[in-house]
Each structure stands twice: as C-alpha cells, then as structure tokens.
Amino acid sequence: MRPTVLCFSGLDPSGGAGLQADIEAIGQSGAHAAIACTALTIQNSQQVFGFEATSKELLLAQANAVVGDLPIKCVKSGMLGTTDNIAALAEFLRAHPDYQYVLDPVLVANSGGSLGDQATLVKAFVELIPLATLITPNTVELRALTGVTDLDQATQKLFEMGAKAVLVKGGHEDTPDFIKNSLYIDGELAASSTCPRLEGEYHGSGCSLASFIAGRLALGDSLKIAVQHAETWLFGVLKNAETPVLNGQKIPKRF
C-alpha cells in the first residue's frame, strides 16, 4: 500500500479547504490520505459562519483506529479549533515519534472567519512547534505565533521556540506582482522561491500546499525537494482554479 499521511483537520462543506483539500492534495502527491476530523465547520467560499469541534476523546479514537492498519509515515494538521484538540494531537505525536509531522498553524480562514479563539490557540501551539518536522505559517500566522512584526526576527523566534524547519509563505505580504516563500532549516535560509501573483483570492491554498508537502515527505522526498514539488504543483492548481457561483474565493482545481 502507498505510504499514508494522517490528516488532523476540519470538514469544509464547500470542499475548497480542510479535509477535502488534504485528501485531494495528498492523492495528487502520490501518497494515501487518512483523516481524523477535528471539527465540523459551517462555511462556504465567502465566509465562516461557525463550527463545532470534535471532542479530544473522539479525535484520538479516530487517529488510533488507523494506526497499525495503514502505513502512516507523516501527520499533517490544519484547523484544530480547540486547545483540547491541540493537546490531543501533541499526545498522539509523542506516542509516535517516528512519524514526520507538517504543522499548518491555521488560526483563521482565508476569508477571515474565526476558526477558534486566536489568543488561546497561539498559546497552545507552543506545545506542537517542537514536535513538527516542518511548520508552514503565512506571514499573518507567523507574526501571531511569535508576537514579532519583523519577519526575519519572527522566524528566528520560532526556532527559539523549538522549530526545526519553517516555510514562510508570503501571499499576505504587500507585493502586488509576486509571492515569495522562504524555507528555513535549523535557523538558516535553505531555499527561497518566487512566483507571479495570480489575480483573486483562493480558498484552501495553504491546506493544499502543506498536504502535498506531507505526501512527498511520506514518499521519501527530502524537505527541500518536497517543498519544491509542492510549490510547482500548487501554482498550476491555482492557475486553473474555479470561481464559485456567488464569486467567493476561488476553489483550487486539484485534479
């Protein structure tokens, strides 16, 4: 059986982000996706209306059900929603130190809607940061996690908090013509990439990127190669994104 990525994330009814994005991106990477649902969200491509989080007990039961049954090589997390779920994931990862782990530190949806109490989640994420093979914050999340405005200083603060590798995504920066991503490993810049900035906004781009990276890691790629493959794939997916009927954020066309 193909190597498996176990995804801890929420269910998005629009199919643009969350678990559906994870499943599609991991499938396109060549790996198999298993899921542990952290929350049922009420959202579309325009906004988040609310969510109901899974209990810690149910979340761990989902994850433990597939351990041993599937060849899990990597864990990926997106929306976790509550501090209990963050604690549950940390407990799971400590029980399985051989799993690689990609942490996408989701605090709000791309549409701006809340996916949990941000201040509380930021404090709880401290427990996950040292457990991650790679953390994939956008610049808004990076500043929120560290409390530091300068991006270079914020990145170094993450390493002081125990990070091993960080992919800083520049899509939220004021660069009208391009987007720059920077990969840091052990506190040093390991690679950077730029791509043209596409028009519009996209629902689930961050989920897709982190999940594709996780899939490639599960298949044995190095961190630098996994990120390179994922960035190339994502740009094509976003170029072909589809616009919803009510003109919300575009849905990446992942297959």
UniProtKB/Swiss-Prot annotation:
Catalyzes the phosphorylation of hydroxymethylpyrimidine (HMP) to hydroxymethylpyrimidine phosphate (HMP-P). Unlike other HMPKs, it cannot catalyze the phosphorylation of HMP-P to generate the diphosphate HMP-PP. Shows no activity with pyridoxal, pyridoxamine or pyridoxine. Does not show phosphatase activity. Homodimer. GO terms for cellular component: cytosol. Keywords: ATP-binding, Disulfide bond, Kinase, Nucleotide-binding, Thiamine biosynthesis, Transferase. InterPro entries: HMP/HMP-P_kinase_dom, PM/HMP-P_kinase-1, Ribokinase-like. Crystals show a disulfide bond between Cys-195 and Cys-207. This disulfide is possibly an artifact of the purification and crystallization conditions. However, as it is adjacent to the conserved GSGC of the oxyanion hole, this disulfide may help to orient the backbone amides toward the oxanion intermediate. It holds the Pfam family Phos_pyr_kin. It catalyses: 4-amino-5-hydroxymethyl-2-methylpyrimidine + ATP = 4-amino-2-methyl-5-(phosphooxymethyl)pyrimidine + ADP + H(+). Pathway: Cofactor biosynthesis; thiamine diphosphate biosynthesis. 4-amino-5-hydroxymethyl-2-methylpyrimidine binds at Q43. It comes from Acinetobacter baumannii (strain IS-123). Pyridoxal 5'-phosphate binds at G18, Q43, N110, S208. CDD domains: HMPP_kinase. It comes from the Bacteria. GO terms for molecular function: ATP binding; hydroxymethylpyrimidine kinase activity; phosphomethylpyrimidine kinase activity. Belongs to the ThiD family. Disulfide bonds join C195-C207. GO terms for biological process: thiamine biosynthetic process; thiamine diphosphate biosynthetic process. Inhibited by pyridoxal phosphate at high micromolar concentrations. This is Hydroxylmethylpyrimidine kinase. The keyword Transferase applies. Its EC number is 2.7.1.49. The keyword Disulfide bond applies.
